[in-house]
Amino acid sequence: TIYRHDIKYSGEHTDSKLARVREKMKELDANAFFLSSLPDIAWLFNLRGDDIACTPLFYSYAWITIDKCFLFLRKDCISAVAFQRFKEHGISILDYTEVSAFLKDQHETVLLNPDLTNYLHYNLLFKCKIIEDKNPTELMKAIKNDIQIDHLKACHINDGIAMTKFMY
C-alpha cells in the first residue's frame, strides 16, 4: 500500500518541491531528471509505502521534465483518490514495469546520479546526453523546514523522557 504523507508532517507540497527540482535542472541545463532513489521519491511526492520491510518506502522511479512528471509505481498499491490527485497536479502515474520501455524512447538531456542508477537504466538512456550529478533532492531533503524542525524537537523531547524513565 502506498499512502500520502500529510503536509502537517512534511511542511511542503509536492508542487513546491518539484518547482525547486526544476530550478536546479535549469541551472544544470538538463531538461529531464531520472530519479531512482526510493527515499528521495518518497520525500519528493510526499508518499510512504510498505513494499520494503521496516521502512516507509515503495518500489518506484520518477522522470521529471520542465513541464511534465511521470511516477512509476505499482498501480494496484495506490488509491483512486491519490491517483486522481496526482493527475490534477500534472503527475502521470505509470506502472512500475513500464520504466524500461519508457527510458528507451527518451532523447533528452538527462540529469541523473550514476551512483544511484542501475546499469540497465543507465544504458537505456544511450540516446540521451547525460549530466552526471548528485540528485538535487538529496540536499533539499537534508535542509529541514520549520514544521520538520518542530517535529524533530518534539521527537527529541519524547526520546529524552523515555530514556530518563528507562534509566531511573
What is each stretch, according to the model?
Residues 1-168:
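Active-site neighborhoods and metal-handling regions in enzymes and metal-associated proteins
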